[in-house]
C-alpha cells in the first residue's frame, strides 16, 4: 500500500495512483468500459472516463488511508465538481459531443488494515458541479 494521505506529496500521489488503479479495476469488474485515465486540460482533470452501457461516465477517484476524518467522497466539493465538469466537457467535445447521456460519479477508496474498501457513488454531482444525493 502507498504512503499516508497526510504525509509528503509523493506519498499522496502514490496513494492517488493506487486508488485510481483499484477503482478502474473495480469498475471494469462491474461492466464499465474504461475509455481514458487522468485526462488533463487547463481547466481541470478527470481521473477516469468510462462507459456504463450507453452512458458516458466521468469518475472522480478519492483515496484515504482511513475514514477517521470522514470518507474520501466527502472531499469532493462544488469547486472540485466544477473542475471535473469542465475537463469532462472538453473530453466529450473531442469524443462524440455533449448530446450523449453523461453522468458524474465518485469512487471512494479507503486503505487501512486488510483489504481496501471501494465505494461507488453514481451521479455524485450534476453538470454544474453541485453535489448529488447519495
UniProtKB/Swiss-Prot annotation:
Recorded GO MF terms: nucleic acid binding
InterPro entries referenced in this protein's UniProt entry, alphabetically: Restrct_endonuc-II-like (IPR011335), tRNA_endonuc-like_dom_sf (IPR011856), UPF0102_YraN-like (IPR003509)
Alphabetized Pfam families for the sequence: UPF0102
Family: Belongs to the UPF0102 family.
Protein name per UniProt: UPF0102 protein Adeh_1910
Organism: Anaeromyxobacter dehalogenans (strain 2CP-C)
Amino acid at each position: 500500500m502507498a504512503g499516508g494521505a497526510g504525509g509528503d506529496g509523493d506519498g499522496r500521489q502514490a496513494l492517488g495512483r493506487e486508488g485510481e488503479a483499484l477503482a478502474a479495476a473495480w469498475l471494469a469488474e462491474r461492466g464499465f468500459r474504461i475509455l481514458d485515465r487522468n485526462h488533463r486540460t487547463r481547466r481541470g482533470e478527470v481521473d477516469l472516463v468510462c462507459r456504463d452501457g450507453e452512458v458516458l461516465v466521468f469518475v472522480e477517484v478519492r483515496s484515504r488511508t482511513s475514514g477517521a476524518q470522514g470518507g474520501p467522497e466527502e472531499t469532493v466539493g462544488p469547486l472540485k465538481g466544477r473542475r471535473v465538469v469542465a475537463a469532462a466537457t472538453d473530453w466529450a467535445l473531442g469524443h462524440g459531443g455533449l448530446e450523449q447521456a453523461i453522468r458524474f460519479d465518485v469512487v471512494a477508496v479507503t486503505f487501512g488494515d486488510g483489504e481496501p474498501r471501494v465505494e461507488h457513488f453514481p451521479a455524485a454531482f450534476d453538470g454544474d458541479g453541485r453535489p448529488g444525493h447519495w
